[in-house]
């Protein structure tokens, strides 16, 4: 989705003082995640950069501290590999050993069009495992802390933000094929990626429903950051990469969209069950079955629960 004439609702210039708030951004060392982390830190937020490469994360933190010496925020790192479920509990514990509050979790990390046959450590197709199963486990492990924070924070301000894509519309109907989650019957690259991003939306919506029912006060919202030339496209072919460059927004637009999803007062629990966020930061209409097919969402959530239970 290409950004038109409407200016972003929230930017680094107007999100206000984030002092006292604790955030986690996954995939925080490049692309949208890096920009988002930058905006939060320069406005005095405590930001945990969750990423795989510890050396790169340390370099990013050092750079941000040098660029924004006046920030009263704090930066820290979490080693996070979403493609290996056996490591994710340790990642969550790394955070929980330091913090008792968490205001917003941005599930931003993901993969797109990896080499054919790529799988996670547990054997899931790489996009399914990294974009869906891994974030499910990480979110589940942090959920009690989010819920505890929501009891003290203003209503609708504690959130889980799930970064999907307009590519969710590429998923065939029904969006989740429970008889082919191992892809023993091969599908196109477009279909596999689309299903993973449709799955992200359905995880967000199902968590929103469950959070309302359990009274936790957590808002769970999905978003489409738009098209930008970020590190996510590193495994695309040359033709696709060229097309992306021709139609892409600046990466800042995707980061502003994420700011809106995580911080805008327009986002409420009621909105999150019915709509998602689109560039450059506004409530938009997604593919409707991803929100209305409650039976598939429930089964999808329960399938993910089954996959992660051995790693809690």
Swiss-Prot record:
* Oxidoreductase among keywords: yes
| Keywords, in A-Z order | NADP, Oxidoreductase
Indicate whether ATP-binding appears among the record's keywords.
no
The organism's place on the tree of life at top rank: Eukaryota
| A Gene Ontology molecular function term of the record | oxidoreductase activity
- Listed binding positions for NADP(+) are 56, 108, 140, 193, 197
Q: Identify which residues the record assigns to the active site.
A: 164 (proton donor), 193 (proton acceptor), 197 (lowers pka of active site tyr)
Which one GO biological process term can you cite for this protein?
Answer: cellular response to farnesol
Top-level EC class, please?
Answer: oxidoreductase
What EC number(s) are associated with this protein in UniProt? 1.1.1.-
Phenotype when the gene is knocked out: Abolishes the production of Aspernidine A.
Pathway linked to the protein: Secondary metabolite biosynthesis
**Role of this protein:** Short-chain dehydrogenase/reductase; part of the gene cluster that mediates the biosynthesis of aspernidine A, a prenylated isoindolinone. The starting point of the biosynthesis of aspernidin A is the production of orsellinaldehyde by the non-reducing polyketide synthase pkfA. Hydroxylation, methylation of one of the phenol groups, and prenylation, presumably catalyzed by the prenyltransferase pkfE, would be needed to yield aspernidine D. Subsequently, the cytochrome P450 monooxygenase pkfB is responsible for hydroxylation of aspernidine D to yield aspernidine E.
Sequence similarity:
Belongs to the short-chain dehydrogenases/reductases (SDR) family.
For this entry, the protein name equals Short-chain dehydrogenase/reductase pkfC
The record's gene field reads: pkfC
């Amino acid at each position: 989705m290409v950004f038109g004439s409407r200016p972003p609702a929230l930017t680094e210039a107007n999100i206000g003082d984030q002092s006292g708030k604790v955030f986690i951004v996954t995939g925080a060392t490049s692309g949208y995640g890096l920009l988002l982390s930058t905006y939060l830190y320069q406005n005095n937020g405590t930001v945990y950069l969750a990423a795989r490469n510890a050396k790169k994360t340390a370099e990013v933190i050092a750079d941000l501290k040098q660029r924004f010496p006046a920030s009263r925020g704090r930066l820290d790192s979490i080693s996070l590999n979403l493609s290996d479920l056996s490591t994710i509990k340790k990642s969550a514990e790394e955070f929980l050993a330091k913090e008792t509050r968490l205001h917003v979790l941005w599930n931003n990390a993901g993969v797109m069009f990896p080499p054919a046959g790529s799988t996670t450590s547990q054997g899931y197709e790489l996009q399914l495992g990294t974009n869906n199963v891994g974030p499910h486990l990480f979110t589940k492990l942090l959920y009690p802390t989010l819920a505890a924070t929501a009891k003290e924070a203003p209503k609708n301000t504690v959130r889980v933000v799930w970064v999907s894509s307009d590519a969710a519309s590429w998923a065939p109907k029904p969006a989740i094929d429970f008889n082919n989650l191992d892809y023993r019957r091969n599908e196109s690259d477009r279909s596999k990626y689309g299903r993973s991003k449709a799955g992200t939306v359905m995880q967000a919506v199902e968590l929103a429903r469950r959070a309302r029912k359990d009274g936790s006060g957590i808002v769970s919202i999905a978003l489409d950051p738009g098209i930008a030339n970020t590190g996510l496209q590193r495994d695309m072919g040359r033709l696709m990469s060229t097309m992306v460059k021709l139609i892409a927004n600046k990466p800042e637009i995707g980061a502003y969209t994420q700011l809106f999803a995580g911080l805008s007062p327009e986002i409420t629990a009621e909105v999150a069950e019915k709509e998602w966020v689109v560039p450059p930061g506004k409530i938009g209409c997604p593919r409707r079955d991803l929100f209305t097919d409650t039976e598939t969402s429930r089964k999808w959530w329960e399938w993910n629960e089954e996959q992660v239970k051995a790693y809690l």
